[in-house]
């Protein structure tokens, strides 16, 4: 029987790197990719976001103005709550559709790559949860470099999420994705051997 494996971590811990490693053996249902589809130009969810936040929430081509929204919601808990209320159900529905589609292959497991796995309750449908970690200093540097953020802006984004220590405490498996990618690969391969036939 196919297992559902949750994959999460804090922002900039390198969860995407681990997801890519897992994708060599197992299908991935990526919540971020699904969100981009659900929140695409002209989609009902995008229209609801515009209705709530105003026209500045989209770019001229109809795509979400993600930098603007990101700055807004990472500095305003009520705005984040409103955005989540608009997007959660459409994304969850699309994810369930993707799980059903992936299960047609009858894999040993399906990876649910969900940044806010615990916050959105996905751990309840998972047989196991993998949490990707990195040190606070590494996370801060990665986020600043990746998103071109100041230290203060990067720290605000980190602080807006569930503390990584809480995610680690709830994990079945913890994968350290600090500075050494070879150790990360070894940990992922070791875990894969416990799941795949």
Curated annotation (Swiss-Prot):
Residue ranges of domain DPCK in the record? 4-197
Biological process GO terms, please? coenzyme A biosynthetic process
Q: Where does this one sit in the cell?
A: Cytoplasm
Pathway the protein contributes to: Cofactor biosynthesis; coenzyme A biosynthesis; CoA from (R)-pantothenate: step 5/5
Any Pfam family from its record, for instance, is CoaE
* Any one GO MF annotation of this record: dephospho-CoA kinase activity
**Which enzyme class, named as a word?**
transferase
Q: Is Cell wall biogenesis/degradation one of the keywords UniProt gives this record? A: no
**The keyword Transferase is annotated on this UniProt entry:** yes
Source organism, top-level taxon: Bacteria
**Which Gene Ontology terms of cellular component type are present?**
cytoplasm
Tell me which UniProt keywords the record has, alphabetically.
ATP-binding, Coenzyme A biosynthesis, Cytoplasm, Kinase, Nucleotide-binding, Transferase
User: What HAMAP family does its record include?
Assistant: Dephospho_CoA_kinase
Quote the PANTHER family the UniProt record gives.
BIFUNCTIONAL COENZYME A SYNTHASE-RELATED, DEPHOSPHO-COA KINASE-RELATED
Q: What does this protein do?
A: Catalyzes the phosphorylation of the 3'-hydroxyl group of dephosphocoenzyme A to form coenzyme A.
The family note in this entry says: Belongs to the CoaE family.
Instruction: From the Swiss-Prot or TrEMBL record, give the protein name.
Output: Dephospho-CoA kinase
The encoding gene is coaE
């Amino acid at each position: 029987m196919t297992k559902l494996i949750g994959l999460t971590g804090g922002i900039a811990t390198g969860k995407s790197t681990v997801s890519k490693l897992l994708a060599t053996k197992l299908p991935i249902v990526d919540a971020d990719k699904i969100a981009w589809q659900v929140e695409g130009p002209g989609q009902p969810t995008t229209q609801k976001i515009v209705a709530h936040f105003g026209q500045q929430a989209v770019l001229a081509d109809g795509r979400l103005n993600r930098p603007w929204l990101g700055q807004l919601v990472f500095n305003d808990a009520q705005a984040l709550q409103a955005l989540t209320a608009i997007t959660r159900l459409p994304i969850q529905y699309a994810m369930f559709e993707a799980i059903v589609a992936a299960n047609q292959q009858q894999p040993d497991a399906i990876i649910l790559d969900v940044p806010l796995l615990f916050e959105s309750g996905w751990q309840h449908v998972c047989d196991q949860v993998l949490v990707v970690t990195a040190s606070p200093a590494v996370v801060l540097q990665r986020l600043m470099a990746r998103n071109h953020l100041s230290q203060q802006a990067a720290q605000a984004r980190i602080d807006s999420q569930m503390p990584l220590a809480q995610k680690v405490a709830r994990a079945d498996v913890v994968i350290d994705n600090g500075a050494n990618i070879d150790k990360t690969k070894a940990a992922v391969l070791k875990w894969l051997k416990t799941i795949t036939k």
